[in-house]
Amino acid sequence: PLPTTRGNPTGPKESKKEVESKTETDPFAW
């Protein structure tokens, strides 16, 4: 489960997209 509260107020769907972009800088986004 991804923490939507981590700067992702748009929702889990957008969160996944953000994670893909933050994966390299956000290891916790996994």
Curated annotation (Swiss-Prot):
UniProt keyword annotations, A-Z: Acetylation, Activator, AIDS, Apoptosis, Host cytoplasm, Host nucleus, Host-virus interaction, Metal-binding, Methylation, Phosphoprotein, RNA-binding, Secreted, Transcription, Transcription regulation, Ubl conjugation, Zinc
Record's GO cellular component terms: extracellular region; host cell cytoplasm; host cell nucleolus
GO molecular function, one term: metal ion binding
PTM field: Acetylation by EP300, CREBBP, GCN5L2/GCN5 and PCAF regulates the transactivation activity of Tat. In addition, the non-acetylated Tat's N-terminus can also interact with PCAF. Phosphorylated by EIF2AK2 on serine and threonine residues adjacent to the basic region important for TAR RNA binding and function. Phosphorylation of Tat by EIF2AK2 is dependent on the prior activation of EIF2AK2 by dsRNA.
Record field: compositional bias (Basic and acidic residues): 13-30
Keyword Ubl conjugation: yes
Major location category of this protein: host cell
Segments of this protein annotated with the region Disordered: 1-30
Localization annotation: Host nucleus, Host nucleolus; Host cytoplasm; Secreted
Record motif Cell attachment site, residues: 6-8
Subunit structure as annotated in this protein's UniProt entry: Interacts with host CCNT1. Associates with the P-TEFb complex composed at least of Tat, P-TEFb (CDK9 and CCNT1), TAR RNA, RNA Pol II. Recruits the HATs CREBBP, TAF1/TFIID, EP300, PCAF and GCN5L2. Interacts with host KAT5/Tip60; this interaction targets the latter to degradation. Interacts with the host deacetylase SIRT1. Interacts with host capping enzyme RNGTT; this interaction stimulates RNGTT. Binds to host KDR, and to the host integrins ITGAV/ITGB3 and ITGA5/ITGB1. Interacts with host KPNB1/importin beta-1 without previous binding to KPNA1/importin alpha-1. Interacts with EIF2AK2.
Note: HIV-1 lineages are divided in three main groups, M (for Major), O (for Outlier), and N (for New, or Non-M, Non-O). The vast majority of strains found worldwide belong to the group M. Group O seems to be endemic to and largely confined to Cameroon and neighboring countries in West Central Africa, where these viruses represent a small minority of HIV-1 strains. The group N is represented by a limited number of isolates from Cameroonian persons. The group M is further subdivided in 9 clades or subtypes (A to D, F to H, J and K).
Record remark: domains: The transactivation domain mediates the interaction with CCNT1, GCN5L2, and MDM2. The Arg-rich RNA-binding region binds the TAR RNA. This region also mediates the nuclear localization through direct binding to KPNB1 and is involved in Tat's transfer across cell membranes (protein transduction). The same region is required for the interaction with EP300, PCAF, EIF2AK2 and KDR.
Functional summary from the UniProt entry: Transcriptional activator that increases RNA Pol II processivity, thereby increasing the level of full-length viral transcripts. Recognizes a hairpin structure at the 5'-LTR of the nascent viral mRNAs referred to as the transactivation responsive RNA element (TAR) and recruits the cyclin T1-CDK9 complex (P-TEFb complex) that will in turn hyperphosphorylate the RNA polymerase II to allow efficient elongation. The CDK9 component of P-TEFb and other Tat-activated kinases hyperphosphorylate the C-terminus of RNA Pol II that becomes stabilized and much more processive.
Family: Belongs to the lentiviruses Tat family.
Protein name from the UniProt record: Protein Tat
